[in-house]
Amino acid sequence: MKKVFIRTFGCQMNEYDSDKMLAVLAEEHGGIEQVTQADEADIILFNTCSVREKAQEKVFSDLGRVRPLKEKNPGLIIGVAGCVASQEGENIIKRAPYVDVVFGPQTLHRLPKMIVDKETSGLSQVDISFPEIEKFDHLPPARVEGGAAFVSIMEGCSKYCSFCVVPYTRGEEFSRPLNDVLTEIANLAQQGVKEINLLGQNVNAYRGEMDDGEICDFATLLRIVHEIPGIERMRFTTSHPREFTDSIIECYRDLPKLVSHLHLPIQSGSDRVLSAMKRGYTALEYKSIIRKLRAIRPDLCLSSDFIVGFPGETEREFEQTLKLVKDIAFDLSFVFIYSPRPGTPAANLPDDTPHEEKVRRLEALNEVIEAETARINQTMVGTVQRCLVEGISKKDPDQLQARTANNRVVNFTGTPDMINQMIDLEITEAYTFSLRGKVVEA
């Protein structure tokens, strides 16, 4: 049985893609063993992300660490996948000729054939094309071990924000046909999955073709998934404010399985910065969406992404972001210091903000967000929350870990048969990033 080591960087789309890489290899070889140490593997894969600073150099650093394994065992297969693979392509082979296969997010289904071609020809294989929906046509049925699962409904992005590489590494937006998505979810439900997380770079741009040739939009998809037997909770990530329509907002009124948590990236509270980012909305328009959502779902918890130190961002503009965070009461959000991505328009903008100032802004924003997170957690003490038990607690092996509808981790004392089940927990203690609870006896 082939032993596979895979290291995944970046977003949930990459996590999903890594699972699919393992699935296609398992189908090809009649099963595989996933190992946690690279030196135990027959196949080593790095599924890369190009969002963070110096992503390319980190990949080559990782490759350098496994080079001695290749020298010791020439039959070892080393592969680079993901967005850095899409950006760098043949350059990876030039810099690291011991790499065997390089493939992008849209060609991971071709991985087994690429390995065979490498072993047959002796030549490294590179495939970073964008064959669109073909990828999903060639993936094996989903197999899961858990109560929650991701389902990719679309890929790519056509927004071309000035700082972002996604359109260049994952291609333009394309949606899976409606029936393909529903079949995968129904299959997961039959395997005991209770929570579905619909996945895409911009899920609310979903436009899936139906059998009759008509187009299903994202709000309609949510309503259909809501009725699939066995599915008890629905999430989605990530969405874009530009296409967060009233029909999607109304789903929060009508669909009780849709959780009271939304991740809706805004990036900045300054209209000038938003314009320079080419985000396509103003801070006021974003606030209008949130106002409508909270009018029909008052308990909605909102998380977001923020970039500080974008080229030209002034202290006043940063203060506008700080005020927006306080006004909307964001929690559980992600704050990043801007770093230029090669090939993006923003990379050409003059950046005169000292790094020390960017760090100060990062810390100031995180302080406000963490305070709000702690406040919300404290309000949950004494309440009973319906939770999905995910497994053994990461903090204490004698405890279990569950997740609330509003995306809080709850550690509690329970029994193994509770794993992957929905249970009621009374929240007894609150911390900044987690909760403690106890089982509510029936």
UniProtKB/Swiss-Prot annotation:
Reactions mediated catalytically: N(6)-dimethylallyladenosine(37) in tRNA + (sulfur carrier)-SH + AH2 + 2 S-adenosyl-L-methionine = 2-methylsulfanyl-N(6)-dimethylallyladenosine(37) in tRNA + (sulfur carrier)-H + 5'-deoxyadenosine + L-methionine + A + S-adenosyl-L-homocysteine + 2 H(+)
Cofactor needs: [4Fe-4S] cluster
EC number assigned by the record: 2.8.4.3
Signal sequence, renumbered to the chain: none
Superkingdom assignment: Bacteria
Residue positions binding [4Fe-4S] cluster 1: 11, 49, 83
Enzyme class: transferase
GO terms assigned for molecular function: 4 iron, 4 sulfur cluster binding; metal ion binding; N6-isopentenyladenosine methylthiotransferase activity
InterPro entries for this protein: Elp3/MiaA/NifB-like_rSAM, Methylthiotransferase, Methylthiotransferase_CS, Methylthiotransferase_N, Methylthiotransferase_N_sf, MiaB_methiolase, rSAM, rSAM_horseshoe
Keyword Cytoplasm: yes
Database matches in Pfam families: Radical_SAM, TRAM, UPF0004
Binding locations of [4Fe-4S] cluster 2: 157, 161, 164
Keyword Metal-binding listed: yes
Cross-referenced CDD domains: Radical_SAM
The entry's keywords: 4Fe-4S, Cytoplasm, Iron, Iron-sulfur, Metal-binding, S-adenosyl-L-methionine, Transferase, tRNA processing
Domain TRAM: 378-441
Cofactor note: Binds 2 [4Fe-4S] clusters. One cluster is coordinated with 3 cysteines and an exchangeable S-adenosyl-L-methionine.
Single GO biological process annotation from the record: tRNA methylthiolation
Localization per Swiss-Prot or TrEMBL: Cytoplasm
Radical SAM core domain mapped to chain residues: 143-375
Self-association state and partner proteins as the record states: Monomer.
Similarity comment: Belongs to the methylthiotransferase family. MiaB subfamily.
PANTHER family: CDK5 REGULATORY SUBUNIT-ASSOCIATED PROTEIN 1 (PTHR43020), MITOCHONDRIAL TRNA METHYLTHIOTRANSFERASE CDK5RAP1 (PTHR43020:SF2)
Record function comment: Catalyzes the methylthiolation of N6-(dimethylallyl)adenosine (i(6)A), leading to the formation of 2-methylthio-N6-(dimethylallyl)adenosine (ms(2)i(6)A) at position 37 in tRNAs that read codons beginning with uridine.
Name the record gives this protein: tRNA-2-methylthio-N(6)-dimethylallyladenosine synthase
Originating species: Neisseria meningitidis serogroup B (strain ATCC BAA-335 / MC58)
Gene this chain is encoded by: miaB
